[in-house]
């Protein structure tokens, strides 16, 4: 790895300083060297070494404003804000045009959640700084803390006007556009940015994300393609290009992208799972199953992998294998209602109705209150002859679905089967009132009830 001249000097200074600590000899460093050493240790979380360097630095350079400002930064880092503020006031009396004094004052107010005051000091710093980009970025962050996304966006854009390579600011601009649901505006801005910086792979990638959000998948692929042409190893752009191809139902192209992703990085369970789904959509069941199995081999605790294999076997109508794999998924996440629902459906297909009833019950207990959960559950209970329990569940469901014909027709059928004809007629009338056309629900699920003369008379009477 080639180091820049500045990095090489910093490395030598660090080696010299650490050698001094080991030998107890005292070496001389200029104040800027000390600043770099201290900031390096702070950035790497070695605060004790930073403090040692600061102490020695101030002994050798007691009047250094730069070192005292680093001291302020350290005090702010340790939440010693009052001491830091006092020291800043002393420095202000000496150097009132030093932008770093205002930046550190802003940091103190920001730490106190006084973001408007922080912005005031940062605006003063703008008068004295040469690094406008950095200050605009800090102002943008303060506005973010205040949830003022418009002004945050405005300042991040100003930062990028000064420094087009500040990718942190670019991400923040896009974050603001996203949060404000301004995808179209984001596209306009990013296109202008790209006109000036055509080789910014990050900008192309963000442009692709905006097109994807607007479901313009052709344009998304186009933008991601440019990002990957500029940087062939841009994994994020490659992955999102693959997702866009999937949306366009271009599954082979998506697979090709995922293959590149695997070459660049160790195969993740997510990539393997996506490839499996693409192969299945192409009708290649053998490759699909192979990649589903690779998915769970890569991450045995990925419940989505096991459930994907379950769904694969359900589509193949191989319910015995589907049952094996859905049990694997439930073993990992036993509180997922969707898994219990599949468990129930698979057991129903295998005519294991008691197990199916247990599955729907567990789905409900895990938070599934969808209409079809109640109807499927009670259909199984009806088959098991548990009419009373089925009625109780459907009556509970009417609290969530008070005007639902599927529930009313089922209640009618169950009450008639239980010889509670008055209640049966009441719910039959409700069903006919809510949806006369779909009265065949009663015929499909309760054929014996449907053929009753009393029921046919009631239907004929309602039609009149």
Q: In which residue ranges do the predicted regions lie?
A:
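Register position in tetratricopeptide repeats
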Residues: 43, 77, 111, 145, ...
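TPR/TPR-like (Sel1-like) alpha-helical repeat modules
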Residues: 365, 413-440, 463
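Canonical tetratricopeptide repeat
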Residues: 70, 104, 138, 172, ...
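Canonical positions in the second alpha-helix
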Residues: 57, 90-91, 124-125, 158-159, ...
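Structural marker of alpha-solenoid helical repeat scaffolds
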Residues: 60-61, 93-95, 128-129, 162-163, ...
